[in-house]
C-alpha cells in the first residue's frame, strides 16, 4: 500500500508465469534458474539488500539478496546453498549494489524475534562489484570473508574482488 500510495508500480511475483528460465553456464551446482522477467528485461539492475543475519547463510547481503528474484529457491537450499548463490552471481551481476545497513538485524535473522535483534549501525555500502560489496559488509559483523562461504567461493572463482586491500574504499561521514 505504501509503495502504491507513493506512486510506485508494484510488480507481481506470486506465480511462476512471471519467471523465465535462464542458464548458468559457469555454474558448478546451479545450471539453470527461473528469474523474474522484470529483472531480465531491465536496462539497469540495482540491488538494494538490507544487511542482516540469516540462519542458513550466516549473513544476507547483496549476493544472497538475489535469491529474491528466483522462483525455486528450494532447489538452492537442497543442492548446496552457498555454491548456488555464488553460481548465480556468474549469470548477471547487478549494475549497482546499495547495502542498507542503517538498522541491522544482528541476530535471529532473517526475520528476528524482537526489536532487541536490531541495532542502529548507520552504514551504507555502495559498489558496482557485488563480491566487494559483500566482503566489506562482513566487516560490520566482525566476520572474515572465508566465514561466509558464498562470498569466499565467488571471490575464488573471480566473480569480483574479495580482498578489501585491493579496493579504493572511500568512507564518508554524514
Regions found by a protein language model. Name each.
Residues 1-174:
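N-terminal and secondary-structure boundary signal
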Amino acid at each position: 500500500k505504501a509503495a502504491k500510495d507513493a506512486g510506485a508500480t508494484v510488480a507481481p511475483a506470486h506465480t511462476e508465469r512471471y519467471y523465465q528460465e535462464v542458464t548458468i553456464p559457469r555454474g558448478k551446482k546451479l545450471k539453470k534458474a527461473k528469474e523474474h522477467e522484470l529483472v531480465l528485461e531491465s536496462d539497469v539492475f540495482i540491488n538494494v539488500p538490507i544487511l542482516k543475519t540469516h540462519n542458513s547463510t550466516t549473513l544476507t547481503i547483496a549476493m544472497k539478496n538475489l535469491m529474491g528474484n528466483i522462483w525455486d529457491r528450494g532447489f538452492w537450499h537442497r543442492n548446496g546453498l552457498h555454491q548456488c548463490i555464488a553460481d548465480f552471481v556468474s549469470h548477471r551481476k547487478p549494475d549497482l549494489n546499495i547495502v542498507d545497513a542503517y538498522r541491522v538485524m544482528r541476530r535471529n535473522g532473517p526475520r528476528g524475534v524482537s526489536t532487541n535483534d536490531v541495532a542502529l549501525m548507520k552504514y551504507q555500502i555502495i559498489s558496482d562489484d557485488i563480491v566487494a560489496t559483500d566482503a566489506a559488509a562482513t566487516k560490520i559483523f566482525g566476520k572474515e570473508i572465508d566465514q561466509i562461504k558464498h562470498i569466499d567461493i565467488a571471490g575464488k572463482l573471480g566473480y569480483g574482488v574479495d580482498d578489501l586491500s585491493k579496493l579504493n574504499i572511500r568512507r564518508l561521514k554524514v
